[in-house]
UniProtKB/Swiss-Prot annotation:
Modulates RecA activity through direct physical interaction. Can inhibit both RecA recombinase and coprotease activities. May have a regulatory role during the SOS response. Inhibits DNA strand exchange in vitro. It comes from Escherichia coli O157:H7. It is found in: Cytoplasm. This is Regulatory protein RecX. NCBIfam families: PRK00117.1-1 (NF001052). Keywords: Cytoplasm, DNA damage, DNA repair, SOS response. GO terms for cellular component: cytoplasm. Belongs to the RecX family. It comes from the Bacteria. GO terms for biological process: DNA repair; regulation of DNA repair; SOS response. The lineage of its organism: Bacteria, Pseudomonadati, Pseudomonadota, Gammaproteobacteria, Enterobacterales. Its main location: cytoplasm. It holds the Pfam family RecX_HTH2.
Amino acid sequence: MTESTSRRPAYARLLDRAVRILAVRDHSEQELRRKLAAPIMGKNGPEEIDATAEDYERVIAWCHEHGYLDDSRFVARFIASRSRKGYGPARIRQELNQKGISREATEKAMRECDIDWCALARDQATRKYGEPLPTVFSEKVKIQRFLLYRGYLMEDIQDIWRNFAD
């Protein structure tokens, strides 16, 4: 680290770091706080920023003010991204909880998203086990276990065979 960077005020260094972090992808406020608090890897190993709690709050407030940090946008994009990867609503809720998103914000975003979870569950099952889906009990149990692991709800999984029988 050069002398000029080490002389920069902690607020400026934190703000620069926050913008760099948020330029890569959206983060929740809690994720950003955790990453800002972590030591920076410099040429001579980890380096701490001598920042006060007020500096962290000012950086977070600045990011909110300028639209870099928005938990509702983060939640909507996260749900869309994880559902495209084949994960179900239960797993997505759990991951959002781990990222510090409130249950209310998660539920609101889940209601607003326009995703057919039953169709996604069926797509995942056919991708893994082929078309037509097996009707033998032991095979159905394997599919059910797989889909539960992926985070789909039991009612969506049961709808696969209900609709399949029609």
